[in-house]
Amino acid sequence: SFIQDLPFSKNHFHKYLPLFPFAIEQFDLSKYDLIISSSHSVAKGVITSPDQLHISYIHSPMRYAWDQMNIYLMKSSYKKFGINLFLRFILQKLRQWDYVSTVRVDKLIANSTFTAKRIKKYWGRESKIIHPPVNTNYFTPNNNRGEFYLSVSRLVPNKRVDLLVKAFNKLHFPLIIVGEGPEKKDLEKIANNNIQFLGFQEDTEIKVLM
């Protein structure tokens, strides 16, 4: 979309969140009979015609616009009154758009039972559940693995890796965290010595850790 051409969008695209709905609606998909979107934010909001079939694979209703709004607003950079108030207004508008735009989808597919419940609660619609595929022939337990717990995740607020870190700070069990994200530095600051951050790892390395 046009957002990728805006200043600093490569590393700070989330700053343009208020523009996401407008951006997704600019895509011209008129030459396609079938539209399949994969959405945790705005992808489901593409505009289609009555003659097109739109199937959307949903990973979640827009978390930061619904039940996890306050988690995002608790970030230190958002706590100033003026910024916080403005973001609350923006997120409330996004919540309205998130709800209204679901009528554009003909068939909703949820990636889990939990997501299906969220779709029903926030959008009032039923969905079919298809779990994300995992190559179980490739990802198998490593009999030579070390004695530690493993977490593989994006380090973003909604994943609540901070709760994991706080729990292992108290348990003192060894924990390895794989993943990158804006929360990484804050998590490293609160983590004890029993917790190790490896950053991004290829599947080959994750397989060894498993």
Model-identified regions with their sequence ranges:
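Acidic anion/phosphate-binding donor-loop and adjacent secondary structure
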Residues: 117, 121, 128-129, 133-147, ...
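Membrane-proximal helix-turn-helix segments that form the acceptor-binding/catalytic region
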Residues: 74-108, 116
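A short beta-strand/loop micro-motif in the catalytic core of glycosyltransferases
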Residues: 36, 104-112, 176
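Active-site proximal beta-strand in glycosyltransferases
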Residues: 34-37, 48-79, 128
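Active-site donor-binding segments of glycosyltransferases and PAPS-dependent sulfotransferases
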Residues: 1-44
